[in-house]
């Protein structure tokens, strides 16, 4: 199988436009060649520092400038975070992800975050954090603490990005991804559907991800969760078939990545999620909350995966 980093927008758009059965057939064939299609990797996500963010991401309820009812909190204590990690492991999660609503981490907080990472690793779990923009030295410190994955999404295409965020550039995001990669940390990077973008923008997001020097090890695909008080409240919801198409094209263009169903899954039917798994999704977030928005209950996920004959890893 040839791994490519030279996808054109026209090629990706042609994949998105394929007849649905043909697209799923191609994606499923690649998925089976690279993974056991019965396995789903489970991650749990915890907000270790909520709200008060100075950024203006139009989808985000944690932005300080939007009145969304999210109260700003301080960075959690290490022992409280590790208690949550133990509970996540007991529930079946193999990776514990920690998110902080920062533009970038302050040096005074790095020691605490590194201690959290070390504690999660000591539990025998994979660790992931999302802390905003990083310097090269901060990325190295996280690596030294044992960090496995760093999440930093591109969100949308380079062309549409300015309609969603003005407080950091696309190049800022790419620079952080380069620091993470140079430090030897696995990259978790994806995007969000339902921001008002067009099909060309969705193709542009895939091109930006698939043409990185190395494909992300993890690619979260989110459907916008609309929150009252954010500028994107009232957007047209993403069509289910269009969402599945993006999962399939992510699988085709990034064969060895874990493609994760992320935000927005609570609103999906079991049948929609089954189509996503058929199209190549093989990771989900587990637990009733993703940072500040809802997520399916663990019992519902276990029941669905059991019905589908799939297993957690």
From Swiss-Prot:
Record text on cofactor binding: Binds 1 [4Fe-4S] cluster. The cluster is coordinated with 3 cysteines and an exchangeable S-adenosyl-L-methionine.
Pathway: Cofactor biosynthesis; biotin biosynthesis; biotin from 7,8-diaminononanoate: step 2/2
The UniProt record lists the keyword Transcription: no
EC number: 2.8.1.6
Enzyme class of the recorded protein, top EC level: transferase
GO MF entry, a single one: 4 iron, 4 sulfur cluster binding
One GO biological process term: biotin biosynthetic process
Family indicated by similarity: Belongs to the radical SAM superfamily. Biotin synthase family.
Protein name per Swiss-Prot or TrEMBL: Biotin synthase
Species assigned in the record: Granulibacter bethesdensis (strain ATCC BAA-1260 / CGDNIH1)
